[in-house]
């Protein structure tokens, strides 16, 4: 801020000049003292300059409403919404989210620095404040087949971007524990730049938590129980309570939060599909849920705003007070988080669920639009030989969780080959390398999916984003793979050799180039098509499928090299 603007702001605060905007007659939330203030709020040049009695060029009468800070999502992969940052803004701003901290490691795993820069530039077009953490593990583990590999030297120049706050979720716990050279350099570079380091401590022991804290990792969003949360807080970490489309952990972790330690907790969505964001909400859903579960409402709102701001060093966000950014919302019902108006930098950006700003986007480079290079798959490529005298090692999904279980199941075979058994809900799963056209694919078995006929497939397969499919028969699995190759990436449902619906994701096989409302409509059509497969369970099968390829979350996952035991960090045979 230059001197003259600084002088002007002080003059408005001192009431020598009228403010551009004054919110009048609302109850104003004081997140510091956790109480209500009866006062006007004056805004000038996107900044709150006063609380008290003020006159404004524009005065908004908010009688009967409450003015609360805008919400902050502390950890989100925008790519999981399947729309670009500018379109993502349209989905979350009406839900009171004014700031997000994003980790673009999905697009980085496919398109490297080119993908990260696309997200950075498009984010500048959004009304939403979008900050970035730099992907720390591309690929997630060294043996993964991703579309890019990012070393410390690749990331270091990006710290000069003002939107970059730090190093994103450090998943490679082996690299940290063994103090591997490049991982050490990534951690040290973040420290030297005085940046925050996010963690990913899924299933880690106390010993490894100590290792992570010694490495200056300050947050974790992979907590699934109250006890895990307390162990991390005890060691000085911030804990994010997560509620996404698959991982739903708020209710289980919430008992850890009390008046003494609440400042170490805040909310995140991590991975949430666009249709869920638009229908259920974002951080507003988590605040609403926490209040319903018995958390003090002031603490819930504080966790939804101030706590995340303080964790990430966003010193002018998260509160309604002089000197803070004018990012706030009016709510008609405090406990139910009924939002009527949302303001970012003092501008009305959403009202009664309608997003106000025009949307500007940038054109993706041709490299981002040509990302699916999978080989042609034949039935013999995905054949899975088994014998009738040994149990099969199977991935058992846990609905609405990212973790899985290793299950031993009696053989399901015909002529020495595995065949899917819908009666026992045991299905074939295939993961095809799609970045370099390699003849490398993992074939395994998964239980608990609930598909009775056909197959589904997606090029969103965390974190390397190869092409993953699951189905009741080989022909439909292959048809689903072919459909996504033709579409240049996306999500598809196939039954009896016919593609029932495909959502194309042409940008790196992860993002649509279409407006949010059209993507939302396509997602609804996709879920209608899912019903034709007999799926009727209470979880998102596409996101569940996509996380079965992430070999850093226990217990077992699939890689292009086969079944992988995460805890013991080794591949497993299908039968043993």
From Swiss-Prot:
Keywords: Hydrolase, Manganese. One of its GO terms (biological process) is adenine catabolic process. Its cofactor is Mn(2+). The keyword Manganese applies. InterPro entries: Adenine_deam, Adenine_deam_C, Amidohydro-rel, Metal-dep_hydrolase_composite, Metal_Hydrolase. It comes from the Bacteria. It catalyses: adenine + H2O + H(+) = hypoxanthine + NH4(+). SUPFAM superfamilies: Composite domain of metallo-dependent hydrolases (SSF51338), Metallo-dependent hydrolases (SSF51556). It is an enzyme of class 3 (hydrolase). Its EC number is 3.5.4.2. GO terms for molecular function: adenine deaminase activity. Pfam families: Adenine_deam_C, Amidohydro_1. NCBIfam families: ade. Belongs to the metallo-dependent hydrolases superfamily. Adenine deaminase family. This is Adenine deaminase. It comes from Bacillus pumilus (strain SAFR-032).
């Amino acid at each position: 801020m230059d001197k003259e603007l600084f002088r002007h702001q002080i003059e408005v605060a001192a009431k020598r000049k009228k403010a551009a905007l004054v919110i009048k007659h609302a109850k104003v939330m004081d997140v510091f003292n956790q109480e209500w203030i009866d006062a006007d709020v004056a805004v000038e040049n996107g900044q709150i300059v006063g609380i008290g009695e003020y006159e404004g060029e524009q005065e908004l009468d908010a009688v009967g409403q409450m003015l609360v800070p805008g919400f902050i999502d502390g950890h989100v992969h925008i790519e999981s919404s399947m729309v670009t940052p500018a379109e993502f803004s349209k989905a979350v701003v009406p839900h009171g989210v004014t700031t997000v901290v994003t980790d673009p490691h999905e697009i980085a795993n496919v398109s490297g620095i080119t993908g990260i820069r696309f997200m950075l530039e498009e984010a500048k077009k959004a009304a939403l404040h979008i900050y970035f953490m730099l992907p720390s593990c591309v690929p997630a583990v060294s043996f993964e087949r991703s579309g890019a590999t990012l070393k410390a030297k690749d990331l270091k120049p990006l710290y000069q971007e003002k939107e970059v706050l730090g190093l994103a979720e450090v998943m490679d716990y082996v690299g940290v524990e063994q103090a591997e050279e490049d991982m050490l350099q990534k951690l040290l570079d973040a420290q030297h730049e005085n940046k925050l380091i996010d963690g990913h401590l899924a299933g880690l022991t106390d010993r490894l938590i100590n290792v992570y804290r010694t490495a200056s990792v300050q947050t974790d969003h992979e907590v699934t129980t109250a006890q895990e949360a307390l162990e991390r807080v005890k060691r000085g970490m911030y804990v994010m309570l997560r509620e996404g489309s698959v991982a739903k952990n708020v209710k289980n972790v919430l008992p850890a939060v009390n008046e003494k330690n609440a400042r170490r907790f805040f909310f995140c969505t991590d991975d949430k599909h666009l249709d869920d964001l638009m229908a259920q909400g974002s951080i507003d859903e988590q605040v609403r849920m926490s209040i319903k579960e018995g958390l003090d409402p002031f603490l819930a709102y504080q966790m939804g705003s101030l706590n995340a701001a303080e964790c990430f060093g966003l010193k002018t966000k998260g509160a309604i007070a002089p000197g803070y950014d004018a990012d706030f919302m009016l709510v008609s019902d405090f406990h139910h988080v009924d939002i009527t108006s949302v303001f970012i930098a003092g501008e009305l950006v959403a009202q009664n669920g309608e997003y106000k700003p025009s949307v500007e986007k940038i054109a993706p480079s041709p490299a981002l639009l040509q990302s699916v290079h999978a080989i042609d798959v034949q039935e013999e490529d995905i054949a899975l030989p088994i014998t009738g005298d040994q149990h099969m090692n199977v991935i058992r999904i846990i609905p609405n969780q990212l973790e899985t279980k290793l299950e031993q199941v009696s053989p399901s075979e015909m002529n020495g080959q595995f065949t899917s058994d819908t009666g026992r809900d045991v299905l074939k799963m295939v993961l095809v390398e799609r970045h370099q056209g390699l003849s490398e694919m993992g074939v395994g078995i998964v239980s608990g999916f609930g598909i009775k006929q056909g197959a589904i497939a997606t090029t969103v397969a965390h974190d390397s984003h190869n092409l993953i499919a699951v189905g009741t028969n080989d022909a439909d699995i292959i048809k689903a793979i072919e459909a996504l190759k033709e579409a240049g990436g996306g999500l598809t449902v196939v039954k009896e050799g016919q593609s029932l619906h495909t959502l194309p994701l042409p940008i790196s096989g992860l993002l649509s180039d279409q407006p949010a409302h059209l993507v939302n409509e396509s997602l609804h059509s996709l879920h209608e098509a899912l019903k034709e497969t007999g799926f009727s369970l209470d979880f998102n099968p596409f996101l569940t499928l996509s996380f079965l390829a992430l070999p850093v979350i226990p217990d077992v996952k699939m890689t292009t090299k086969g079944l992988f035991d995460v805890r013991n960090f080794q591949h497993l045979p299908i039968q043993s």
